[in-house]
Amino acid sequence: MADVRTAPRYSIVPGDPVEHKREWLGLADRNLPFAVQGREARYSKYYEDNPLGPAKFFLARDSQSDTFVGMAAIFQTQLRVFGELVPAAVAGDFAVDDGHRGLGPAVPLQRAAVNALGEHGLSCAYGYPNEHSEPITRRVGYTDLGRLSRFVKVLRSRVVVEQYVQSRGLARLAAGVSRVTLDPLLWAA
């Protein structure tokens, strides 16, 4: 897919997981919440090693600085709809650098991601936009079907301990104790 021109200042470029990894990591560091597993591990998991295929992502290039200032992605998945598996995507990793928001590349980035759905045989996409990106996702055709509640059953207390205990040594000690004392209770509940 060739570069798609948006406004004179920005162009939307299809991302390449090998060629654009450094740019993605930079945009993520500047704009996205910290990934619990770390940025490199998250990138590998979703952009390089996803068993359903690598993420399809797009970058916005600022022609004035010749730098990438935004990104949007879709992650292939499967949904079960009325008993049938449907090829779908999760929309995510949507970020635009400060100073390029507003009338910048946000809408063209999301349009590129939505257009990629059909090109890759995906039937639909869903996402979890924050309050700042909701108007943009609506503008490109997403519909709010309702709120999603996630229910999680923790089976290993180590995951929770490592998330909240800052000291690595203390986290390791607490995880060891919780493995013996809490994990059996978690499995029984």
Question: Where is each model-derived feature located?
Answer:
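Conserved active-site tyrosine of GNAT-family acetyltransferases
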Residues: I136-T137, Y142
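Conserved acetyl-CoA-binding loop-helix of GNAT-fold acetyltransferases
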Residues: V96, R101-N115
